[in-house]
Amino acid sequence: MALIAGKPMIQHVYMKACEAKLPDDVIVATDNEKVFETVQGFGGRAIMTSPDHPSGTDRLAEVALNFPDVDVIVNVQGDEPMIPPEIIDRLAKAFEAESDLKMATMKVLMREEDYNNPAAVKVVTDNNGYALYFRAA
């Protein structure tokens, strides 16, 4: 597990998520026993999910089914230790602004040097900012 300043990366992500004002709770959903134990070890809350999910979206759907009373779930990837807590709040606020919204994803303008980076996910949107498709290439 990657360490940053002596702490696991997932702990930094967890702490950033806890700094956001809107979430009532922060839970790490994982299919990895080591991640689960690490989160519990630093006092965080974690749940184990199925290892058979083909994507993170499927994992998130499992979490949503297990927490039917929760209105909004914000998905933060475990490799985002520098995520500004304000981003989490902005995403959560989108659901307050549009009551019929079912899913939202944050996007940012891409730096020119990332255009040809296959690890950088690109999104194509319509004129209203709604995603048409995502691409990692």
Regions found by a protein language model. Name each.
Residues 27, 33-76, 80-93:
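Short phosphate-binding loop-to-helix
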